[in-house]
Amino acid sequence: MSATTPLLESRLQSLPLLARGKVRDNYAVGSDRLLMVASDRLSAFDVVMGEPIPGKGELLTRMALFWFARLGHIVPNHLTGDAPESVVSAAERSQVTGRSMLVKRLKPLPVEAVVRGYLAGSGWKEYQHNGQVCGVKLPPGLKNASKLPSPIFTPATKAEMGEHDENIPFERMVEIIGAPLAEQVRRVAIALYETAAAFALGKGIIIADTKFEFGLDEAGTLTLMDEVLTPDSSRFWPVEGYAEGINPPSYDKQFVRDWLEQAVVDGRPWNKQAPAPALPADVVARTAAKYREALERLTA
């Protein structure tokens, strides 16, 4: 498989497949490690699109590795430092090179750690309805894309494949994982966001919001896992396109979301259930270009 061939699904025979997520295929490596292969699949509204985004898996992996290295002083991460190619057969290396991470097997927390620095997406919709986001009361008079007085932590429960993640108040997170761990996750997630957002702003990118995932290692240490600060887990806006009161142009999959919002299936708006309508070639190409530009801008 050449580097330019899109990978919709990995097919490794040398390792047992544990799960196919919306984007990543996870394989067991012994009892204590996982091989995470980032495919070129794209999901929006928790539905996986039928068309791969060429180069996406490699770009996601490069960006995640970039951030893991930059944020390692705040919290440990799941990387082992071992080469993904070392655990597959020679014939399978082309499926993993550049798009995989060999990571520690952790006990994942059942709550996603979402941090918002700006009002956007579901947060903006909820604010219009009741002046708050996930139980966090916000000042009146904010607009779509307004910068918040300070970043807010708005957890969500993890959805099963095909279901929608559900925003929950912090109090519910405390009930699920306990107060000490919930408070640690909130503190660490906000620190990660603030550090990354300040760096990205210096590169001309606003990180409006992002989602972190954490797990516990065998010693019970909180560990950053999965992906981090990629266009799949974050809303990235170029500073030159930013203004309050609009949906700023973005480097993430918002471009696909916007197209899907106006997509018609059988004469009706798409109901955000699988299967998704086929993405036009120009939407695929422009999305691939957005991912590429975000990485180039951040790492320049």
Curated annotation (Swiss-Prot):
Catalysed reactions listed for this entry: 5-amino-1-(5-phospho-D-ribosyl)imidazole-4-carboxylate + L-aspartate + ATP = (2S)-2-[5-amino-1-(5-phospho-beta-D-ribosyl)imidazole-4-carboxamido]succinate + ADP + phosphate + 2 H(+)
Entry keyword Lipoprotein: no
Pathway in which the depicted protein is active: Purine metabolism; IMP biosynthesis via de novo pathway; 5-amino-1-(5-phospho-D-ribosyl)imidazole-4-carboxamide from 5-amino-1-(5-phospho-D-ribosyl)imidazole-4-carboxylate: step 1/2
GO CC terms in record: cytoplasm
One of the protein's GO biological processes: 'de novo' IMP biosynthetic process
Protein origin, superkingdom: Bacteria
GO molecular function: ATP binding; phosphoribosylaminoimidazolesuccinocarboxamide synthase activity
Entry's EC annotation: 6.3.2.6
SS bond list: none
Keywords assigned: ATP-binding, Ligase, Nucleotide-binding, Purine biosynthesis
HAMAP family: SAICAR_synth
Family per similarity comment: Belongs to the SAICAR synthetase family.
NCBIfam families named in the record: PRK13961.1, purC
Protein name (record): Phosphoribosylaminoimidazole-succinocarboxamide synthase
Organism: Methylibium petroleiphilum (strain ATCC BAA-1232 / LMG 22953 / PM1)
Gene for this chain: purC
